[in-house]
Amino acid sequence: MRSIIPLIAVFLLVGSALQMIVAAPNLSDEIDETGMNRHTFSLLPKAFQKNPELEMTGFTVMTDYGKTQPVASLKNPVYYQIHNGGEQLRGEITTYSEVPAAAVLADMLERSLAVAGYQPAKGPQKPALLLNYFWGAHDRMDSDTAEKFPELARNYVIERALLIGGKDYARRLSEELDRPSLVIDHTLKADFLRDQAMDDLYYVVVSAYKFDDVAHHKPQLLWRTTMTVNSHGINMVQGMPALIVMAKDFYGRQSTQPMALRRDVRTGTVKLGPLEILESGPSVSAPSPSK
């Protein structure tokens, strides 16, 4: 097993300089629209579709330490302060002209966390958690560059796999790249995840630490939620808010495996269309996640 995966995981850790930010909500309360599941096929490229379909993944890793902490709920909220790590471009770095406003993302993040039972600490309320979040793009190499630098191109794939499904999925995909004969799982979900790791994507990462541990310079990860979306045919202004909205069902909830999701985005809004969850077989209908 290559040693690259633990090294790659370092980029997900919180920085030493922590700036506490509490955003004041200023958008409509309705940030998510759910409905019955369906999948629509279009011959038009995403860039020309009125409501382009988003191909997303969601995953949360929970540490043993995190399992000892209180579970957040609407009745028993967990309070936090937040550090905005900002935009981070990775892989074959590309310049993006359409980037969402930091204040808009902070607002949406606060409200999606609230749906999951996490509230910002205000006034005398002491925070239990320090949340660190950052977002950006992770792009693959073009074929010519990948031929010249195959090892670096491979490392980029593993980095994207880490964002998609954590160390276990990154390790499994690494083994498949080393031995293509191991690729025996060609279910809809398995192919979806593999394609996601091979292609350009946008991502959002939210990591949770116990606030007192950070204050004493002994941060230990509690949980980390990572969301990705294939970036072809959509810009960051469309992709990032959608990821943050969908993350509400993943914060602080351990994932046994990465979730593969398809959903359309309503152009010009932050509302999402019906959700389709891809299972390890033919796609099936499933209730939309709770608001």
Question: Where in this protein do the model-derived segments appear?
Answer:
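A structural "domain/chain start" motif
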Residues: V22-V104, Q125-L129, Y133-A146, L272-K291
